[in-house]
Amino acid sequence: MQIPEKYLSSVDNVEEETQILFALSKQKDADLGMLDSKQEQIALTIGNKPIKVKQSLQSLHQSRGSTGSVLWKTSVKVVPWLLQQSWFMNSLTPKTSILELGSGISGLAGILLSPFVGNYVASDKQLYLKKIRENLDQNNASDVEVHELDWKSTPYPKDWTFDFLDYVLFFDCIYNPHLNAHLVSCLASLAERYPGMQCLFAQELRDQETLVDFLERVRPYFEVDLIKMEEINKTSVASSTNLPPANMSLFIMKPYNHEEYMLKALNEAKKCEPTDSAFCVGAVIVQNGKIVSTGYSRERPGNTHAEECAIEKFMLKNPTDSLEGAIMYSTMEPCSKRLSKKVSCTDLIVKQKFSTVVLGSLEPDIFVKCEGVDLLKKAGIVVIEKLTFQDDCLREAVRGHPPKH
């Protein structure tokens, strides 16, 4: 999905940027975002397509947390707008695969989008699946697959029939702070399996703290951009009346390519002079999707460590800039204690307020016992262990050490 850069705003400072969104969103929704919470069946026309949606008001009123039992305004407003955007429609082909999370009972997005793609999967909790199927079938969308996908359990349907995934969609799914961690875990698992996928999500702006919490949790795994719908509409042939209301926002997310950056860190480690008294480690710092610094063990004068070198090089080049929210890639767990009594790399990372540390391997207890991972997590930093690189990283780390007998 190629969106012109001028229509994207990178979400770097979550607090500040969500505050602006909510300040501009003056429209209050008395019905909490539901299209109509009083009718068992809703009839609407989108484009030239008549659609009927059966709701389950009994489930909504009797079952706690049954928010998927009704049709929500966000999908009604945002999906038709997307259908009018060339950058969106040009990305849909007969080979495109889409997974929708938290589809809810209506199946509306699948009804509207499935004619343009090869595979569309609507997913939600087990209790909604039968009703989703009914709504899809009565609206001639029987080709849409329906699968159980509970964010708290399996990250993807076990009986899913295709091997690749282009897009993940979800509409108005960020409403309960207790579910944010599960949603992010699900998204991270999907990104691990399908690193080329992109996520598109629309959200009604109801609770700023809940949205901030979600964005802070998801940013270690994804680059997040706000799509400027109002700016797009200024240059679009579509009528401005089709613009979703100001209290709805649309975001696009792309998984960080952890493998690519870890390979670059491994290449940094290969630059180290071998020694039997220290490790050979490489580090790469990524900020806003770009490499801003690199380092390797003993690159700078003194017994300097890779992470230390990368941070020092950045600060020397950008003395007024901050590394807050950046991602540190290191071929080995950052040190928590140094025999030289210098500040540990773990402390440096915490001080600079990195959001995430991605590791190629844990540190062997050869010189000192390392507690870097525990200390980073205790400081609120996300730690991602890419242990598929462990053998290569450890082999490089002990280059110069005497062979074990």
Swiss-Prot record:
Keywords: Cytoplasm, Hydrolase, Metal-binding, Nucleus, Riboflavin biosynthesis, Zinc. Zn(2+) binds at H305, C335, C345. Its cofactor is Zn(2+). It catalyses: 2,5-diamino-6-hydroxy-4-(5-phosphoribosylamino)-pyrimidine + H2O + H(+) = 5-amino-6-(5-phospho-D-ribosylamino)uracil + NH4(+). One of its GO terms (molecular function) is protein methyltransferase activity. The gene is rib2. Belongs to the cytidine and deoxycytidylate deaminase family. Its EC number is 3.5.4.26. The active site is at E307. Involved in riboflavin biosynthesis. Converts 2,5-diamino-6-(ribosylamino)-4(3H)-pyrimidinone 5'-phosphate into 5-amino-6-(ribosylamino)-2,4(1H,3H)-pyrimidinedione 5'-phosphate. This is Diaminohydroxyphosphoribosylamino-pyrimidine deaminase. GO terms for biological process: nucleobase-containing compound metabolic process; riboflavin biosynthetic process. It comes from Schizosaccharomyces pombe (strain 972 / ATCC 24843) (Fission yeast). It holds the Pfam family dCMP_cyt_deam_1. Pathway: Cofactor biosynthesis; riboflavin biosynthesis; 5-amino-6-(D-ribitylamino)uracil from GTP: step 2/4. Residues 256-383 form the CMP/dCMP-type deaminase domain. GO terms for cellular component: cytosol; mitochondrion; nucleus. Binds 1 zinc ion. It is found in: Cytoplasm; Nucleus.
